[in-house]
């Protein structure tokens, strides 16, 4: 089971170690609000694709307000000069949701080498610059262990190195207990658009076991 299912979704729940990316309560309009959240997340990722965004958490504490928390490696790109970019984003979300109370919080990801989303985006960016996929994967693995990662698995699929036949190459180092629910495993994917086609990147990072006095998000 742990080998097939998404490592993040497998651990989501109030008694487990992961949390939902959208927190809201709506009896009749759940579908509409959920689609809005997807559009907001897509808009942020497109506008600030150079900021290397790790996660976009959307909370709706009431029917009149929305709180958006953005975790990124380069928060200055999202904020902009004197907050100009974040003001544009706020207005776009106000027009999309028809809400006047829009709050946006930006958080910097400091240990970005053990953040699966940022690592996957970094590998994809290197592949687009025609860096060898083996070199990109090995560099990511080494950097992860330097920042405290206990295990990492990286997979690249597609026409690697411009080969005629698509294939999958992967590297794994350290522990990767996918079946253990208390194991804090971060998982993410990314796509590299190359001249030979699309290359898919998957990253699993094991950070250690969950402790009762600490909840990982």
Swiss-Prot record:
GO terms for cellular component: cytosolic small ribosomal subunit. The keyword Plastid does not apply. GO terms for molecular function: mRNA binding; rRNA binding; structural constituent of ribosome. It comes from the Bacteria. The keyword Ribonucleoprotein applies. Binds the lower part of the 30S subunit head. Binds mRNA in the 70S ribosome, positioning it for translation. Belongs to the universal ribosomal protein uS3 family. HAMAP family: Ribosomal_uS3_B. This is Small ribosomal subunit protein uS3. The gene is rpsC.
